[in-house]
């Protein structure tokens, strides 16, 4: 797949982009793991479930607390992905290969990798069981199992992805199909969806819409394209400041938005999508498409739904300030699998990791946690091939911006940060346990003021 060349207008911006790319290339891949998969030891001081962003980051931090030989991570996959870049992969601006490294290369040196899937959690006995039947006990448990994609809850999927006009940026199996569908677009409806469930990176479903609109303009197809965003929500974005900015972009670019529309069926042979109208029970809306981008329904992993650590919706039930489980004091959660009332993003995981590290440090010393997570999360809203609105906010859905300028404005610099600096931070700082979010930068840029 040949990526579309990013449009950067000024010489200063182009120089900045080259600098960031050079830094990323020089850094090279992480080479943190020197051991092999665990085959013998069955008890660990700290056991981490999940090898995604939260799991790897916390395994690294816990290695420093208790020693590598006392930490293990349970993760079945041989590949680790930096998923935020898939928005740009689906729009042809980045290669998929840039988003992947081997799991072996990102697990910290000396930490034991149990390459298996979690089958059962038994927090009352301080142990878990894997698919292979292995029982592993722990003193402290960190749950970082992520979120589950439920494509099968939409009639006609996932088998519908075999057809050429459907894609989804949420799966490694389908993200490149988005780019192919975009390239193959001739005329008609370009349809983008948002489901009636919690999702990871709630801005991503509309990011690909803005990028597609920009691609159509760039290739001369815009006059023949009717761009439609069907969302199950009642608003374009959950933070008013950024919602107002997005509404202006939607108006300027002539995008149609239908609220309370939830995708329930895809008819790929007819190129039709069927939506239920949430505020009109029993009513459906069938829309033909020339291109369809699907954001799937999502939920907590099945293994959590049937476990004692879950709340009524299946998410890990943690204190929203300390990330400690509400019932089991030696169990902790981080990231998408938790019921933290904030947007599920990699930026949120970074901020949570610093809080959780400090929380566990104090608990290990029989002290009360004092560091409190404020719900910080971030969503770089890509609005074009060289424009981003950098949304940052907290539990109260109020802006919590890092930079000393209005981040609701589209900026080239924020696009460069999204496309080049953030991947660098992820691979070289966050996964190594050195990046806990931009709170210290916020204080610096705002001269210590809130």
Curated annotation (Swiss-Prot):
User: What does the entry's cofactor note say about binding and number?
Assistant: Binds 1 FAD per subunit.
Q: Sorted alphabetically, which InterPro entries does this protein's record hold? A: FAD/NAD-bd_sf, FAD/NAD-binding_dom, Sulphide_quinone_reductase
Location of this chain's protein in the cell: Mitochondrion
Disulfide partners: 201-379
User: Which sequence ranges form a coiled-coil region, renumbered to this chain?
Assistant: none
Which one of the record's GO molecular function terms can you name? sulfide:quinone oxidoreductase activity
Q: What is its main location?
A: mitochondrion
Binding-site list for FAD = 53-54, 75, 83, 118, 336, 344-347
A Gene Ontology biological process in which this protein takes part is: sulfide oxidation, using sulfide:quinone oxidoreductase
Q: Pfam families, per this entry?
A: Pyr_redox_2
State the UniProt keywords alphabetically. Answer: Acetylation, Disulfide bond, FAD, Flavoprotein, Mitochondrion, Oxidoreductase, Phosphoprotein, Quinone, Transit peptide
Q: According to its UniProt record, which protein family does this protein belong to?
A: Belongs to the SQRD family.
> Main role?
Catalyzes the oxidation of hydrogen sulfide with the help of a quinone, such as ubiquinone-10, giving rise to thiosulfate and ultimately to sulfane (molecular sulfur) atoms. Requires an additional electron acceptor; can use sulfite, sulfide or cyanide (in vitro). It is believed the in vivo electron acceptor is glutathione.
Protein name listed in UniProt: Sulfide:quinone oxidoreductase, mitochondrial
Species of provenance: Mus musculus (Mouse)
Which gene is the coding source of this polypeptide chain?
A: Sqor
């Amino acid at each position: 797949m040949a990526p579309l060349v990013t449009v950067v207008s000024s010489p200063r911006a182009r120089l900045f982009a080259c600098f960031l790319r050079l830094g990323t290339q020089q850094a090279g891949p992480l080479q943190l793991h020197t051991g092999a998969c665990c085959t013998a030891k069955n008890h660990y001081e700290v056991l981490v479930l999940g090898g995604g962003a939260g799991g790897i980051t916390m395994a690294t931090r816990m290695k420093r607390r208790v020693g590598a030989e006392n930490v293990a991570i349970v993760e079945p996959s041989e590949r680790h992905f930096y998923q935020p870049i898939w928005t740009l992969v689906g729009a042809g601006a980045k290669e998929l290969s840039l988003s992947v490294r081997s799991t072996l290369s990102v697990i910290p040196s000396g930490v034991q990798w149990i390459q298996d899937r979690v089958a059962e959690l038994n927090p009352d006995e301080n142990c878990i069981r894997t698919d292979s039947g292995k029982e592993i006990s722990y003193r402290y448990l960190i749950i970082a199992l992520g979120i589950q994609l439920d494509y099968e809850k939409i009639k006609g999927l996932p088998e519908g992805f075999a057809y050429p006009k459907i894609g989804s940026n949420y799966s490694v199996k389908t993200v490149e199909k988005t780019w192919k569908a975009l390239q193959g677009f001739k005329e008609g409806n370009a349809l983008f969806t948002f489901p009636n469930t919690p999702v990871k990176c709630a801005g991503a479903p509309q990011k690909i819409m803005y990028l597609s609109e920009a691609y159509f303009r760039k290739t001369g197809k815009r006059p023949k394209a009717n761009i439609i965003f069907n969302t199950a929500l009642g608003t374009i974005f959950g933070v008013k400041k950024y919602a107002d900015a997005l509404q202006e972009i939607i108006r300027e670019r002539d995008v149609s938005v239908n609220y309370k529309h939830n995708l329930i069926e895809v008819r790929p042979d007819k190129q039709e999508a069927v939506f239920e109208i949430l505020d009109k029970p029993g009513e459906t809306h069938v829309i033909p498409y020339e291109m369809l981008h699907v954001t799937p329904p999502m939920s907590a992993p099945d293994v959590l739904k049937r476990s004692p650590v879950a709340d009524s919706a299946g998410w890990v039930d943690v204190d929203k300030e300390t990330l400690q489980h509400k019932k089991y004091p030696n169990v902790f959660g981080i990231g998408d699998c938790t019921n933290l009332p904030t947007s599920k993003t990699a930026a949120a995981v970074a901020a949570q990791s610093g809080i959780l590290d400090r929380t566990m440090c104090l608990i290990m010393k029989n002290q009360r946690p004092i560091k409190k997570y404020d719900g910080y999360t971030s969503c770089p809203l890509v609005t074009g091939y060289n424009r981003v609105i950098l949304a940052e906010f907290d539990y109260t859905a109020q802006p919590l911006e890092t930079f000393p300028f209005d981040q609701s404005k589209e900026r080239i610099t924020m696009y460069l940060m999204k496309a080049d600096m953030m991947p660098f931070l992820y691979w070289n700082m966050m996964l190594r346990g050195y990046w806990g979010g931009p709170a210290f930068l916020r204080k610096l840029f705002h001269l210590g003021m809130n």
